[in-house]
Amino acid sequence: MDDNEEYDTKRKTRCGLHVHPDFYGVYLLRSVPKPKSFYIGSTPNPQRRLRQHNGELKNGGAYRTKKSGFRPWEMICLVYNFPSKNVALQFEHALQHPYQTRHIKSELRITHKRNSGNTLHHKLGNIRLLLGSSFFSRMGLKVLLFDPEVHSAWCINKFGVNVTDNVQVNVTRFEDYFSRDNNDESSGFSLSRQKESERIYFESSKKILFFDNQPCFICNETIDYQSESEVSFSSKLDVDAYLREGNMPLLAICYHENCRKLYHLSCLGLHFLEKGDELSNKTDSEEKLGDTVNYLTPLQGKCLSCNNFINWAKLSKMSTKLREYFLKDLLNTGATSQFIENDADD
């Protein structure tokens, strides 16, 4: 992981609140000249990170990938959609140490020693085990496979590790999914396209909050995101204190067209958990746990208004970004604006 590379991963420090990163992934590299050699890392920018590993960029890379005879490297698998950088780093560390991580139960492990489990099947099997762990299984993580051979090995599933249907797996070419500047509209991932989609969602949400005056559809409590007095902060601690006082609670706005019903995120989350959202197929970890676990995070649920299913990972991601959007809008005056701009350069 290169601490200098990012899209927008430092937004947590900008406003003193958690915001889902635009993109963060854990990747698996394979050496082209030595295809039995692998490397595991994490990044918010896969295209640039791969170029660093291959020496195309002066800065970055890693000692192991610089060794003579191993370049070029190819990225063959990427797990992404993590809710934070820290969670991605936990996944990365667990994948690097599958023989001892707490995220894989001892009776389910397929790698038992530090220097074992170095085949492609072991790497993919451990990714499957982590995707099915009680910690990671409800985050809406997604998988990209960039090679037909890797896809074949994934489907063979040599160690018989189940993953749930809510884990989205896609097969594509790395060059088709990531463009050089990450803004190519024709590529699979386009930051500009993502930002435009968010802008449309934020603008429609602004109308709901400021003009429609909708209360929470569950508790019927009025939601007021407009401060009656001028707000000015001198530090991130002031922002944290402001939010802890109950200002600007996290909101959930149904993202289905022609609905846009408003909820407190906490109200909707509790409702989804009470209703239950059974997996269509359980992971091996969940089979072992049986009914002994009460999850704190739902997978999905139905909007009480339009009756369409809402993906919790997608909704919670937009909820953190929505609050950041309104907080910046609220603070975008005078000294407060300068505070945010200066903090962005930290």
UniProtKB/Swiss-Prot annotation:
Name recorded for this polypeptide: Structure-specific endonuclease subunit SLX1
Localization of this protein: Nucleus
The family this protein is said to belong to: Belongs to the SLX1 family.
Assembly and oligomerization: Forms a heterodimer with SLX4.
UniProt xrefs under SUPFAM superfamilies: GIY-YIG endonuclease (SSF82771)
Gene3D superfamilies referenced in this protein's UniProt entry, alphabetically: GIY-YIG endonuclease, Zinc/RING finger domain, C3HC4 (zinc finger)
Gene symbol of the encoding locus: SLX1
First and last residue of the signal peptide: none
Broadest EC class assigned to this enzyme: hydrolase
Chief place where the protein resides: nucleus
PROSITE patterns: GIY_YIG
Its biological purpose: Catalytic subunit of the SLX1-SLX4 structure-specific endonuclease that resolves DNA secondary structures generated during DNA repair and recombination. Has endonuclease activity towards branched DNA substrates, introducing single-strand cuts in duplex DNA close to junctions with ss-DNA.
Mapped zinc finger ranges (SLX1-type): 216-306
Pfam families: GIY-YIG (PF01541), SLX1_C (PF21202)
Any one GO molecular function term: zinc ion binding
